[in-house]
């Protein structure tokens, strides 16, 4: 950095004596010569300063250029590293799902492959493919669309090409699931509330533990509310997840009004500037109106405390029950306006195809899929990865 130079301009006083006065004339000449020397010195110094400044600027430009090149190189390396990490993550997710979804994959890939070992006519092969899709619990509507896509695209000769058939099915399946691929976008500027609902035994509390762990890893503050006040075991289980994840759990005594627990939890969460509040609720049959009314009351309490609170009503579904999930989604959605779905226990069933029926029947985003008891056994739903996992190429060779 260069300081500004302040240049003083020198003036000269007029000689009050007569010009013919020799002494004064000589004195004036001496003063003029002295002033001229001072001016010359100033000009010389100014010239040197400009030269020095020019040299320094050139050096700064060179240094700046080198820094920019270094920064650009570092940025390129960072982007490349992020891209490689993204690709590795996708490959890791695919490998994990392919391993975990063994039963669903067997229902699709392996049994479909076995159809091609025997000589079949065009129509009989189509019938067998249709039957296998139905057995996979993919649903009548989706099965019909998949078979129709095979008829439109493939000829009698091409239908005997297993790899071609698989690619046609994968393309159509991805189009169906793309409509419900919707990660949960959380606005961390205000408290975000996740109300977890579902029937008994679908894995709500385990899911809450996984979500808490996931958001904590992202550096977000989380608090849990034990809205299932009917079972002491439910409260104890949620407390255990809270201890494991080092998050607070808001509870009340057994038999308390669940809405009062939610009220306390929201007040505390807002007071402590918590990012995410996850509410556990009692498992209930979807045909019990009084229990559904209780969930509606909880939603009203949330809105009454603060109408600006962002809220997700997350319905948890057990993949093991197959097509029965359709009725659950219908009832819960009509009563509570479900905003997101989670499909659990995909590792324990061959009925994972139900996700296609749900996607066709309802346009509710699938937030997560879960496939085990470990914290890592949960993934944000990705339609491409899911379809590639259940129709993985290594089972077709």
From Swiss-Prot:
Write out the annotated subcellular location: Cell membrane; Cytoplasm
Q: Name one GO biological process term.
A: SRP-dependent cotranslational protein targeting to membrane
The keyword Glycoprotein is assigned to this record: no
Q: A cellular component term (GO) from this record?
A: cytoplasm
Catalyses: GTP + H2O = GDP + phosphate + H(+)
The alphabetical list of record keywords is: Cell membrane, Cytoplasm, GTP-binding, Hydrolase, Membrane, Nucleotide-binding, Receptor
InterPro entries xref list? AAA+_ATPase, P-loop_NTPase, Signal_recog_particl_SRP54_hlx, SR_rcpt_FtsY, SRP/SRP_N, SRP54_GTPase_dom, SRP54_N_sf
Kindly indicate whether the keyword GTP-binding belongs to this entry. Answer: yes
Q: Its Enzyme Commission number?
A: 3.6.5.4
Molecular function terms, GO-annotated: ATP hydrolysis activity; GTP binding; GTPase activity; signal recognition particle binding
* Tree of life domain: Bacteria
State the membrane topology: Peripheral membrane protein
Sites where the protein binds GTP = 198-205, 280-284, 344-347
Top EC class of this enzyme = hydrolase
Q: Which SUPFAM superfamilies match?
A: Domain of the SRP/SRP receptor G-proteins, P-loop containing nucleoside triphosphate hydrolases
Q: Which family does it belong to?
A: Belongs to the GTP-binding SRP family. FtsY subfamily.
Name the job this protein performs: Involved in targeting and insertion of nascent membrane proteins into the cytoplasmic membrane. Acts as a receptor for the complex formed by the signal recognition particle (SRP) and the ribosome-nascent chain (RNC). Interaction with SRP-RNC leads to the transfer of the RNC complex to the Sec translocase for insertion into the membrane, the hydrolysis of GTP by both Ffh and FtsY, and the dissociation of the SRP-FtsY complex into the individual components.
- Quaternary state and interactors: Part of the signal recognition particle protein translocation system, which is composed of SRP and FtsY. SRP is a ribonucleoprotein composed of Ffh and a 4.5S RNA molecule.
Q: Which NCBIfam families match?
A: ftsY
* Entry protein name: Signal recognition particle receptor FtsY
Q: Which organism's genome codes for this protein? A: Buchnera aphidicola subsp. Baizongia pistaciae (strain Bp)
């Amino acid at each position: 950095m260069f300081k500004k130079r302040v240049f003083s301009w020198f003036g000269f006083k007029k000689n009050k004596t007569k010009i013919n006065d020799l002494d004064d004339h000589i004195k004036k000449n001496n003063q003029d010569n002295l002033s001229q020397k001072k001016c010359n010195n100033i000009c010389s110094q100014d010239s040197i300063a400009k030269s020095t400044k020019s040299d320094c600027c050139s050096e700064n430009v060179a240094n700046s250029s080198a820094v920019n090149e270094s920064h650009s190189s570092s940025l390129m390396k960072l982007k490349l590293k992020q891209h490689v990490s993204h690709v590795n993550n996708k490959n890791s997710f695919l490998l994990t799902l392919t391993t975990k979804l063994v039963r669903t994959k067997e229902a699709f890939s392996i049994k479909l492959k076995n159809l091609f070992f025997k000589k079949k006519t065009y129509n009989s092969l189509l019938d067998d493919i249709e039957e296998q899709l139905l057995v996979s619990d993919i649903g009548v509507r989706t099965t019909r669309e998949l078979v129709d896509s095979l008829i439109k695209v493939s000829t009698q000769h091409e239908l005997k090409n297993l790899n071609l058939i698989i690619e046609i099915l994968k393309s159509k399946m991805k189009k169906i699931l793309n409509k419900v691929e919707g990660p949960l976008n959380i606005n961390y500027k205000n408290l975000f509330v996740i109300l977890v609902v579902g029937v008994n035994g679908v894995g709500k509390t385990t899911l809450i533990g996984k979500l808490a762990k996931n958001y904590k890893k992202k550096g977000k503050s989380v608090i849990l509310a034990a809205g299932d006040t009917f079972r002491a075991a439910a409260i104890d289980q949620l407390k255990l997840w809270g201890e494991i994840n080092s998050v607070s759990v808001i509870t009340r005594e057994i038999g308390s009004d669940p809405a009062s627990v939610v009220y306390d939890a929201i007040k505390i969460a807002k007071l402590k500037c918590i990012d995410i509040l996850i509410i556990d609720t009692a498992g209930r049959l979807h045909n019990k109106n009084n229990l559904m009314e209780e969930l509606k009351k909880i939603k009203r309490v949330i809105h009454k405390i603060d109408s600006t609170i962002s809220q997700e009503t997350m319905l948890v579904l057990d993949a093991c029950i197959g097509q029965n999930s359709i009725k659950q989604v219908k009832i819960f959605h009509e009563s509570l306006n479900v905003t997101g779905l989670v499909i659990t226990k995909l590792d324990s069933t061959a009925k994972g195809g139900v996700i296609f029926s749900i996607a066709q029947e309802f346009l509710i985003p699938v937030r997560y899929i879960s496939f085990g008891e470990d914290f890592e056994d949960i993934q944000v739903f990705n339609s491409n990865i899911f379809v590639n996992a259940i129709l993985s190429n290594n089972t077709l060779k």
